[in-house]
Design a protein with these regions (language model features):
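Extracellular glycan-targeting catalytic surfaces
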Residues: 27, 31-215, 250, 273, ...
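Secondary-structure capping and boundary motifs in well-ordered enzyme cores
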Residues: 168, 224, 278-285, 307-310
Length: 408
């Protein structure tokens, strides 16, 4: 259908790809045999059921108390506290943040590309103010979150049918879901009508693009599937939707898409599907994979250890090259789409440009589980163990995910 401006919305992308009908990307051409697939689906159904704990998207009551303890101790030599100060001083984390939107339509490109910088700041502010609320209990942060979200809910009509629509939906549906989850489950003055309004925006504007991604043939680099899946899992928890949650699990463990764990990360070396593309996108992808694992972990499911700690291997490979080591193996493989198979060397583009993703993985594999991640540690050492804002939804991760003082 068209709006009065002539911009096309919600046309199934398979119409743009030449396919006659949508294909379920979750199950198409699985590498598993039929018997293994049945076993896998049975395992997924029985073992990967969310606890539906609230709050429960990236953070639960225990991790919130841990963050509050770090702030209360105010140890100036603690990187977690130093990272908290960086977060607190970010303009997007201020309760007096000045909203730049809202807009009727938002996009990353073409006619509405001019909105991108502003809505990214607005949704980033909702995310960071939600964190500041659960840490400080200063009501001004909770009200700022709901101001941002409800104003967008009142005005936002759609995401134009551009190439990046699904990626946009993945990034920002997650930020919105996280912010709404943190405030709606912990702030007793919230108005249910406001919560309903924001949920309607998520269902009517963002969710159709996420569903669309799952219903079409694979077409993108792997970070897309991981970003979409993180948003889908977050919405599943927000809405207490076990089937949505399990759909995400099936995709990341068994999906025929560059964004599933086994298609994104080589089981032998940890090389990632985008390692030959550039280091910015591969860090984006592996960070999204790590955050999916953390969301599931907070819901009682261990994706971190899945496929023999596959996500850890991806982190270590990526950290090793980005910290400066050249002796990393590289092989050219045929990706799921066949479009991104020409890379014959690891890419030096954006090499060493640190993204705030490594503290998350180090916290789980080393602090919680006692495993070794020498290259991830080297990356953190090189960057003084400080997190930062990347807009990737695990910003300031050294503060957010640091369980060294807890018995995990």
């Amino acid at each position: 259908m068209k709006n009065i401006l002539g911009v096309i919305f919600l046309i199934p992308i398979f119409l743009l790809t030449g396919s006659n009908k949508p294909i379920d990307a979750i199950y198409s051409k699985s590498d598993l045999s039929e018997s293994e697939l049945v076993k896998s689906d049975t395992f997924l159904t029985n073992e990967y059921t969310p606890s539906l704990e609230h709050p429960g998207i990236l953070h639960n009551t225990k991790s919130i108390e841990r963050m509050r303890t770090v702030v209360h101790k105010a140890n100036a030599t603690d990187p977690a506290y130093q990272t908290y100060l960086l977060m607190r001083n970010d303009y997007r984390a201020k309760s007096d943040y000045q909203l730049k939107g809202p807009y009727e339509y938002i996009a990353r490109q073409k006619d509405y590309a001019w909105t991108k910088r502003n809505y990214e700041a607005d949704f980033g502010a909702a995310y960071l103010n939600a964190l500041m609320w659960i840490i400080t209990q200063d009501e001004s942060h909770a009200t700022k979150v709901m101001e941002i979200l409800t104003k967008y809910a009142d005005k936002l009509k759609g995401i134009p049918n551009h190439n990046d629509a699904m990626l946009l939906a993945g990034f920002h549906a997650f930020q919105i879901a996280f912010a709404l989850e943190m405030v709606s489950t912990t702030y007793d003055k919230i108005q249910q009508t406001d919560v309903d309004k924001v949920n309607n925006m998520l269902r009517n504007v963002f969710l159709p693009w996420l569903d669309n991604f799952y219903s079409i043939p694979p077409f993108s680099n792997g970070n897309w599937g991981l970003i979409v899946s993180r948003a889908y899992m977050g919405l599943a928890i927000l809405w207490n939707d076990t089937e949505m949650y399990k759909k995400t699990i099936k995709f990341v463990l068994n999906g025929y898409d560059n964004g599933s764990f086994p298609k994104y990360i080589d089981e032998e070396t940890g090389q990632c599907q985008e390692s030959g593309r550039d280091q910015a996108h591969v860090q984006l992808g592996i960070g999204a994979a790590g955050s999916i694992c953390e969301i599931a972990y907070k819901q009682g499911n261990d994706l971190y250890s899945a496929l023999n700690n596959l996500v850890m291997k991806g982190y270590e490979y990526t950290a090793k090259f980005n910290v400066g080591h050249n002796n990393v193996p590289f092989k050219t493989w045929t990706d799921v789409t066949g479009k991104y198979s020409g890379w014959n060397t690891i890419s030096p583009k954006a090499r060493g440009n640190y993204r705030s993703i490594y503290g998350l993985a180090y916290n789980h594999y080393v602090i919680r589980k006692g495993l070794n991640m020498p290259y991830t540690k080297e990356m953190l050492d090189k960057n003084n163990w400080l997190g930062k804002f990347d807009g990737d939804c695990i910003d300031f991760d050294v503060f957010q995910f640091n369980d060294k003082d807890l018995n995990n």
